[in-house]
């Protein structure tokens, strides 16, 4: 700024006083003079206006920077919180997956045990049914054999024995039958 004023005074001092006021056709010289005058007026009269304008602009810029920093900090906090929540959700998902695998394994073992038990019960029931049917068939065959034997014995005893001998043989056969036939067979 002092350079400008120095230049103005240098130019004014080089001018002769006799020339006075007039029309200067040198564009470069007149522009410098005009600029110097305008700047001088602006610096003296509008200094407070420009200072307050620059201060307001500086405050607005600083406020914008502070707001941007605050928004950045909030965004960083939200990002960190979201990352923490994501990690927590990931851990919970891993735990749920591990628990479901464990539960599935336990259910599989339980089902296999139930299948084994049911198979064993079915085999036992099958064997019991077979044994029961065998006993039933044997019992039926015994009855038929005994009945046929009795019929034959009676027929033979009628033809060969007298009454007294028939009674004795009959009692003996009844006694033998009583021992052979159990209460379940009747």
UniProtKB/Swiss-Prot annotation:
<keyword id="KW-0934">Plastid</keyword>
<protein>
    <recommendedName>
        <fullName>ATP synthase subunit b, chloroplastic</fullName>
    </recommendedName>
</protein>
<keyword id="KW-0793">Thylakoid</keyword>
<dbReference type="GO" id="GO:0045259">
    <property type="term" value="C:proton-transporting ATP synthase complex"/>
</dbReference>
<keyword id="KW-0547">Nucleotide-binding</keyword>
<comment type="function">
    <text>Component of the F(0) channel, it forms part of the peripheral stalk, linking F(1) to F(0).</text>
</comment>
<keyword id="KW-0138">CF(0)</keyword>
<dbReference type="GO" id="GO:0046933">
    <property type="term" value="F:proton-transporting ATP synthase activity, rotational mechanism"/>
</dbReference>
<dbReference type="GO" id="GO:0009535">
    <property type="term" value="C:chloroplast thylakoid membrane"/>
</dbReference>
<keyword id="KW-0406">Ion transport</keyword>
<dbReference type="Pfam" id="PF00430">
    <property type="entry name" value="ATP-synt_B"/>
</dbReference>
<keyword id="KW-1133">Transmembrane helix</keyword>
<comment type="subunit">
    <text>F-type ATPases have 2 components, F(1) - the catalytic core - and F(0) - the membrane proton channel. F(1) has five subunits: alpha(3), beta(3), gamma(1), delta(1), epsilon(1). F(0) has four main subunits: a(1), b(1), b'(1) and c(10-14). The alpha and beta chains form an alternating ring which encloses part of the gamma chain. F(1) is attached to F(0) by a central stalk formed by the gamma and epsilon chains, while a peripheral stalk is formed by the delta, b and b' chains.</text>
</comment>
<keyword id="KW-0150">Chloroplast</keyword>
<feature type="transmembrane region" description="Helical">
    <location>
        <begin position="27"/>
        <end position="43"/>
    </location>
</feature>
<keyword id="KW-0375">Hydrogen ion transport</keyword>
<keyword id="KW-0067">ATP-binding</keyword>
<dbReference type="GO" id="GO:0005524">
    <property type="term" value="F:ATP binding"/>
</dbReference>
<keyword id="KW-0472">Membrane</keyword>
<keyword id="KW-0066">ATP synthesis</keyword>
<dbReference type="InterPro" id="IPR002146">
    <property type="entry name" value="ATP_synth_b/b'su_bac/chlpt"/>
</dbReference>
<keyword id="KW-0813">Transport</keyword>
<comment type="similarity">
    <text>Belongs to the ATPase B chain family.</text>
</comment>
<keyword id="KW-0812">Transmembrane</keyword>
<comment type="function">
    <text>F(1)F(0) ATP synthase produces ATP from ADP in the presence of a proton or sodium gradient. F-type ATPases consist of two structural domains, F(1) containing the extramembraneous catalytic core and F(0) containing the membrane proton channel, linked together by a central stalk and a peripheral stalk. During catalysis, ATP synthesis in the catalytic domain of F(1) is coupled via a rotary mechanism of the central stalk subunits to proton translocation.</text>
</comment>
């Amino acid at each position: 700024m002092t350079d400008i004023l120095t230049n103005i005074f240098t130019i004014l001092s080089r001018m002769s006083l006799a020339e006075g006021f007039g029309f200067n056709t040198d564009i470069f010289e007149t522009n410098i003079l005009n600029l110097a005058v305008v700047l001088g007026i602006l610096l003296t009269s509008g200094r407070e206006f420009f200072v307050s304008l620059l201060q307001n602009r500086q405050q607005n810029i600083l406020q914008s920077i502070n707001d941007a920093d605050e928004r950045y900090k909030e965004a960083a906090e939200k990002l960190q919180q979201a990352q923490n929540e994501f990690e927590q959700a990931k851990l919970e998902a891993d735990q749920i997956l591990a628990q479901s695998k464990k539960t599935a394994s336990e259910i599989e073992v339980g089902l296999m045990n139930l299948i084994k038990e049911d198979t064993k019960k079915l085999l036992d029931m099958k064997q019991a049914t077979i044994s029961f049917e065998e006993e039933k068939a044997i019992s039926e065959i015994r009855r038929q054999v005994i009945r046929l034997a009795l019929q034959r014995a009676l027929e033979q005893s009628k033809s060969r024995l007298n009454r007294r001998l028939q009674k004795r043989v009959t009692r003996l056969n009844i006694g033998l039958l009583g021992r052979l036939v159990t209460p379940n067979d009747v």
